[in-house]
Amino acid sequence: MPFRSFRSSHRVARFAAFAVAALLTGTTLPVAAASAPRLLAYYPWYAKWQTPSYTSAQIPYGEMSNILHAFIEPTPDGKLQIPKGFLEPALLKDAHAAGVRVSVSIGGAGAGHAKAFSKLSASPATRAAFVKNVSAFVAKYGYDGVDIDWEAPVAPKDTKNCLALMQALRAAFPAPSYQVSMAVPASPQNSGTGLDIPHLAADVDYFNVMTYDFTGPWSIFAGENSPLYQSPNDPWQTGSLQTAMDLYTGTYGISAAQLNIGTAFYGYQFDGVDTLWGACPNGSCNNVVTTIDYGSAIKPLIGKKGWTESIDQTSGAPYLTRGNPATYISFDDPTSTANKVAYVIGQRGFGGMFMWDLSGDYDGHGQDLLTAMWSEYQVLGDGFRAR
């Protein structure tokens, strides 16, 4: 079925499934609020210094349920490093006025953060110090919870120590007054020593599954950043939203309601390659790949002379190519983004979706990808899950 026209059938099928179940069991249909999904947004503090600048004043709070304010940094001894410019009192004030919960996100990509988490989680004393410092920060500035982004456990005991750390955080931030979440990879067992997802589930309100970065500078060919489905043409069979969702619900046994599925507001540009699955020069993509935002860098190229937009019909992923100089860009557009919402929320009934990151589709005037997500939530007829 073409990826440009399948969303409404999912909405009808979802309602029909609920209706049949109700008739068979004699129960009434659930109201929207009981099954309404979340829409979460990672908001990086440094977005204000990007071009175009994106601050808390640009955030359309009515189009999301939660904000994850990224990132403050952990230290090996359990302290917190607060970047200069991180604090935005208006963010908390305006979000709360709109009924949006804000969690502080700690960590992020980078070996330094992973090493800090590894060391601070290794002993009861440093775990306690970390939890104490996080608790003080949340209380002082009025956050509604904490999100941990540990990418990824690498030391032999990290998997066990990560579980102990999350248990301590959950004890300090009880539900429903506070929310505790984790950003987790699409394939946890392929990331360092792995994460004990089944046991971690008892200590988090939800997981944010990072279903993007299926391709990048580490690849040897130009692949797809965040495909909905696994393409049979992918030489490495690196995965997709669907394979990650099946892994978490099937292998790990996690409830769909506890899972938020990610989408990317950025793409990857491969220089020296002009076809999907084309090999990078000299057998490595390390020096030919650039991360570029949708709003400021990718959107202006769509329809521009010399560029061709195509859709991988096997995966649902759009991409741009140029012949001279040879260039390939993997990204998501409004249609592929809406299609993900229709599949994740409408067809599969997962707990929510999120994006990395909220500023990525801002073009100085609007946010096409966020609008596509929000519009699809409205098409599905759901409000946001109770905050």
Where would I find each of the regions flagged by the language model?
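Glycan-recognition patch characteristic of GH18 chitinases/ENGases
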Residues: 34-138, 284-286, 367-383
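Active-site groove signature of glycoside hydrolases
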Residues: 131-159, 209-213, 354
